[in-house]
Amino acid sequence: MNVQNVGGYQTGIDYLPAAGKNISEREDVSFNVEEATAEKVNEGAIKTAEQKTQDLKDAYAVMTSGVNSTRTTNDNKTVQRRLTQLGFYSGSVDGNLYTDASKKALKNFQRVYGLAQTGQISNMVQDKLKAATSCYRAVASKSDLGTITSMVSGYSDFKESEIRDYFAKTWAFFRVGMGLTVHQASGVLGNIMAESGCVPDNAQDTGTNKKLHDKDYKFNVSDGRGYGLIQWTIKERKQLLKDTSSQMGLPVNDINAQFACFRKETERDDMTKSAWKTLKEHDMIDTSTGIFLSKIENPKVQNFDERYSKAKIIYSVMK
């Protein structure tokens, strides 16, 4: 058989219905060679365009996520375990970072720790996550952390393991997420322990209600009652907490939603932004305690001595 290849199609002279006729004399040729060639070229052009589109999508995915093809399921499980420890993830540790739950957890972590909110893993995200988790674990496992947690042991609903967890997460946020030194973080945490005991669902005490947890409190931006880690009180600040938690798909009592709210305050609120900048310029416990008290938290009772005392105790444990 005399086979010719034209545009990827095979044709043969002996395909003719009657011997002796050449290809130009065929009456029942099943296809036209020129049309077939044009069809094949067009098909190739379409495939080329589709491939280019896919190549661009693949390149964009790599560029935005930093995902390396060498990542393994175990690598991704480690990411999920770390997100779980920091309170961002509660789903199955299956190594799939493309589920809605995993992407939400990553995006919320990125928001809290000041990274681009892609919802995808990258080397930068992985490094920050590892640093935050390492910091959390080191603090949570401290044998003498009870010196700090006992500051709120007088409350009837006190649970040492719970305060240990909250404190460790808060310390990791301010040290790894907000870049504070040990002196600065001690001053900030001295204030937070005095205000809320590091409990995110703590509402301002009333004459009849003095607990760490206020699970029955109905969050109201206009009621003038302090709430959360730093006891957000005025309408604008409580509204920001409500909006931030909603954007993250979390309740207002979630500790990470409150971290994200505080970060946003330091970035957009002129007074808080200026005070935060000043705090970070001074590496002293008393200065950071005072600035956080009077310029950032600004409670009615300016009890500096109590807060500074707590800050020094925290520093003695955390240094």
Predicted regions and their residues:
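Acidic, Ser/Thr/Pro/Gly-enriched interdomain connector segments
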Residues: 2-12, 27-29, 33-96, 152-156
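A glycine-rich, coil/turn loop motif that links secondary-structure elements
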Residues: 68-72, 92-103, 118-125, 251, ...
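Stable alpha-helical elements in mature extracytoplasmic
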Residues: 75-79, 98, 102-105, 121, ...
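Short, functionally critical alpha-helical segments immediately adjacent to catalytic or ligand/cofactor-binding
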Residues: 122, 182-199, 206, 262, ...
